Amino acid sequence: MLLRIKEWFYYKTSEVAEGYNTFIDVTEYSRVDGVLTADKNGYIEVIVREVLNETEKAIQVILDSGSVVGNVKCWKTWIPKSVIAK
């Protein structure tokens, strides 16, 4: 499943994940000439492995990570619905 989230939220989540040597994967759609780039509305597309839980205000997901370097890891996080593209 693919999910488009706000660029600032992606970077905030990535910063925490990188502290655990985990790098969140994005789709090729979010890369321009190999550089991570948000679309014109400020969204980055991430790869969701599994949706664990959903509340009125947020969803808990497992995001893919590590496919670029061949190390399959995942990152579990809550994503507020306010940062998800409609």
What does each model-found stretch correspond to?
Residues 2-86:
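Feature detects long, helix-prone N-terminal segments enriched in hydrophobes
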